[in-house]
């Protein structure tokens, strides 16, 4: 497929705008949560579903929707998904009950699962020149990173003047713009030999991913003592094992499991998982640091994190020329090494640290993240024929969703466990209050407010200091993981060419011998 240059760059703009909308929406709910709870009064289980159902639907359907896009057309799927996303955003904004809100958020997740793989696979199909493709994927990665940083800022700004639903209603005009312009500008592309969509694989992939993500999120929130965590984890792992075995037998699988035997593909996936694993856990810790330790407002804390998004955007934009100069393995290793260095800098943060130091640490870590994601995403896409770009995009994004959930579960547990175990309270604190104080820093500040003034001041100061100490331990754990991954990535990606040539299918629909995907 030959696409005129203006339409190529128009496609990139629309894909980036769609991804920007999704990235903002992934983080904006946390800003709206306090007002939402105050006005709607959901029960505790309802609130957890309001927060989590979007991610469950999104993660569970990415693989399926990536394959659907390869079959019916990526443009068609994107326009359908964006229309549904706009409608679901309006339903979410005006939800009258918690049950309505949960259903609307689930629909948002389904729509998001159609959009995410469509954006990246369209870029893969219109940018057939390998060097321009690397540049385009770098721009897409930059915009995605910027969107995650903008979410808290946009949410905080809207909530200062409007009701909680405004953070979702703002999606509607952007979705309309994408649908109207995209219907004219976007070229259509699909796999000319898609084969039959295996209807057994679809539920296996959905159950496997959703159950594992549910188990990880539940473990992060409630610990691993409950039977529900283990039942969900077992169900998810069994489903994923059955899914993987079935893919190996199918002529037209949802996921070509042979790709994981290719070092470039599996190495890039692994780098993505561990990088997002560490970054999301650090983001969670520092959101609490800004708001609960320093006492900043949600808007101020969102603005404080903006340099990180800008750094990641800059890293993504610079990745393509760096690949030309250094090669893929070295750029990924450099990115992971910079992220590790940034985490070491994070590990020195205490209650007296100035914001300027925080900005420096954020920029170092986030530029490294930008390098890593831009190169690994391009490597993943380049490892498969463009006819299967939707499936490859879905694999990458599913791995990131699971890596993020795993990071919050594991490093979040390190943070919470260190806080609980190291907190030393004055003897005069009542036992029931002590239990609430040990539960979380937020609970500590709320409980301390009801204690006598002098005792409240002591408890508040102690809880904040213990949290900061625990945060230091958590980010240093992340630094070690990133440093180890930098060494592993250098080995795994060694020999991957700077410019990965186009992968074509033979007459039977398999990657031609000698291509990257066939190795």
What do the predicted segments below correspond to?
Residues 177, 378-379, 395, 399-494, ...:
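Hydrophobic transmembrane architecture of multi-pass small-molecule transporters
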Residues 25, 54-61, 111, 143-147, ...:
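MFS transmembrane alpha-helix packing/gate-lining sites
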Residues 2-4, 177-206, 248-266, 324, ...:
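Flexible interhelical linker loops that connect adjacent transmembrane helices
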Residues 172-190, 208-218, 235-249, 486-493:
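C-terminal membrane-cytosol helix-exit motif in multi-pass small-molecule transporters
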Residues 8-24, 29-31, 41-44, 200, ...:
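12-transmembrane solute porter fold
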């Amino acid at each position: 497929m030959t696409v005129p240059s203006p339409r190529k760059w128009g496609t990139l703009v629309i894909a980036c705008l769609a991804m920007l909308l999704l990235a903002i929406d992934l983080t904006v709910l946390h800003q709206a949560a306090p007002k939402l709870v105050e006005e709607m009064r959901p029960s505790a289980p309802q609130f957890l579903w309001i927060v989590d159902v979007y991610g469950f639907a999104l993660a569970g359907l990415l693989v399926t929707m990536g394959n659907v896009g390869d079959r019916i057309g990526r443009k068609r799927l994107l326009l359908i998904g964006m229309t549904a996303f706009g409608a679901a955003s309006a339903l979410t904004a005006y939800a009258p009950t918690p049950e309505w809100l949960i259903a609307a958020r689930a629909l948002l997740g389904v729509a998001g699962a159609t959009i995410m793989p469509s954006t990246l696979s369209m870029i893969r199909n219109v940018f057939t020149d390998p060097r321009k493709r690397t540049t385009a994927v770098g721009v897409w990665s930059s915009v995605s990173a910027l969107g995650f940083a903008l979410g808290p800022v946009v949410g905080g700004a809207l909530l200062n003047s409007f009701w909680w639903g405004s953070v979702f209603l703002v999606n509607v005009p952007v979705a309309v713009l994408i649908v109207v312009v995209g219907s004219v500008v976007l070229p259509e592309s699909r796999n000319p030999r898609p084969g039959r969509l295996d209807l057994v694989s679809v539920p296996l992939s959905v159950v496997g991913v959703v159950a594992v993500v549910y188990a990880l999120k539940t473990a992060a929130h409630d610990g691993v003592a409950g039977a529900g965590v283990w039942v969900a984890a077992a169900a998810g792992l069994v489903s994923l094992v059955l899914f993987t075995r079935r893919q190996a037998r199918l002529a037209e699988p949802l996921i070509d499991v042979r790709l994981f035997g290719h070092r470039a593909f599996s190495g890039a996936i692994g780098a993505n998982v561990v990088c997002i694993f560490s970054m999301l856990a650090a983001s969670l810790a520092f959101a609490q640091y800004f708001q609960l330790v320093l006492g900043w407002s949600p808007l101020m804390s969102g603005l404080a994190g903006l340099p990180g998004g800008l750094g990641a955007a800059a890293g993504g934009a610079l990745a393509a020329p760096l690949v030309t100069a250094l090669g893929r393995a070295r750029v990924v290793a450099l990115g992971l090494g910079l992220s590790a260095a940034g985490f070491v800098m994070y590990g020195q943060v205490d209650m007296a640290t100035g914001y300027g130091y925080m900005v420096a640490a954020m920029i170092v870590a986030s530029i490294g993240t930008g390098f890593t994601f831009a190169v690994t995403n391009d490597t993943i896409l380049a490892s498969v024929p463009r006819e299967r770009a939707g499936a490859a995009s879905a694999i990458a994004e599913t791995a990131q969703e699971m890596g993020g959930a795993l990071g919050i579960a594991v490093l979040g547990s390190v943070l919470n466990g260190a806080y609980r175990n190291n907190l030393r309270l004055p003897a005069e604190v009542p036992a029931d209050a002590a239990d609430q104080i040990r539960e979380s820093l937020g609970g500590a500040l709320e409980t301390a407010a009801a204690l006598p003034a002098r005792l409240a001041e002591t408890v508040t100061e102690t809880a904040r200091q213990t949290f900061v100490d625990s945060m230091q331990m958590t980010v240093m754990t992340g630094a070690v993981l990133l440093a180890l991954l930098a060494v592993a990535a250098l080995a795994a990606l060694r020999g991957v060419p700077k410019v990965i040539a186009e992968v074509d299918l033979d007459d039977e629909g398999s990657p031609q011998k000698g291509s990257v995907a066939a190795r």
